[in-house]
Amino acid sequence: IAQVSIDPAYQLKPEAKKSAPIDKMLGADISFLPELEAKNIKFSDKGLEKDAIQILKDHGFNYVRLRIFHNPAQPKGYSPTKGFCDLVHTKEMVKRAKALGMKVLLDFHYSDYWADPGKQFKPLAWEGKNFSDLKKSLYDYTYEVMQALKAQGTLPDMVQVGNEINHGLVWPEGSFSNTDQLAQLINAGTAAVKAV
């Protein structure tokens, strides 16, 4: 039986308000869109060139999913030369989606690169931190991203604290073999989301 420590520094706050229920959710992960557009790739619907997000909306989509990496521009990151899926790109994408009336699911990878069941490498900036500082870094980063989105009036409608965390997140501290620490990291990220 797993036991989970509750860190009083990351107490969960109740939600400020409940989202209005929706009849259906139909969404797409459009995180690649800025990369495709940077390559001058165009999108069309029945021969008419349109914004890709508008095409989704026109076909009944009401949600988009956007991933965010901690620092994808660092040399071993996801996008060393462009920084795709960083906070700057994510803010712009959320703004575009919200302007078209789409809802947004924000997916925190807590890595500079892909995080999935086979790898959950912590950001380079968090390497060497003790667990308490690692947890604080995860909280602070989550809070800063949420605050930045709130400041531009585009808070996400849903947040995914970690990507594909079947085997944990922010390895090795948050691996599934360290369930107490994993739970504390998830709790810290969730607390940061709810604090905004």
Question: Residues of each region from the PLM?
Answer:
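Bacterial Sec-dependent N-terminal signal peptides
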Residues: 1-6
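N-terminal substrate-binding region of glycoside hydrolase catalytic domains
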Residues: 7-103, 111-138, 160
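Active-site cleft segment of glycoside hydrolase catalytic domains centered on the general acid/base Glu
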Residues: 80, 85-89, 115-196
